[in-house]
């Protein structure tokens, strides 16, 4: 019997962004800085889809940091920006993730890390969070020049996995990820 395939969004679904909260507050002086940054990042990626602008998640993450620095009238140094972006590679998994992934894999499911982030970043995130043994495959949409929820990125995942798109399942915290 062929394994069923489940794609997992990584940022916020598998990995917990809350560890970034004190770092963002220290740099920007606001409890809301992290959520504002991530919202701007996701908004920008959606605008890129709608306007067919090619970018990378890394470029958008940098631009979103600049935007919130301006919003909070903060002098964002290159060192602070680098520290914030580097910390994104060291996020912990949510407390129930390892047990959930293990249960799925033990029951014959193929688990796939699937993200808008670069392959290098996702691979680092998976390794640094201790999840290397919990995913069969890691897929970045970066190669497509677009982002979730553009339907092309799901077709790309299906092609990469050599599976019909209708055989794929997606687990995501964000409902818009499932609209592609």
Model-identified regions with their sequence ranges:
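Substrate-recognition element of Asp-dependent hydrolases with the DxDx(T/V) motif
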Residues: 79-92, 97-127, 139-141
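A metal-dependent, Asp-based hydrolase signature
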Residues: 46-82
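A short acidic, helix-capping loop that chelates divalent metal ions and anchors anionic groups
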Residues: 23, 45-50, 121-123
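Nucleotide-sugar-dependent
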Residues: 172
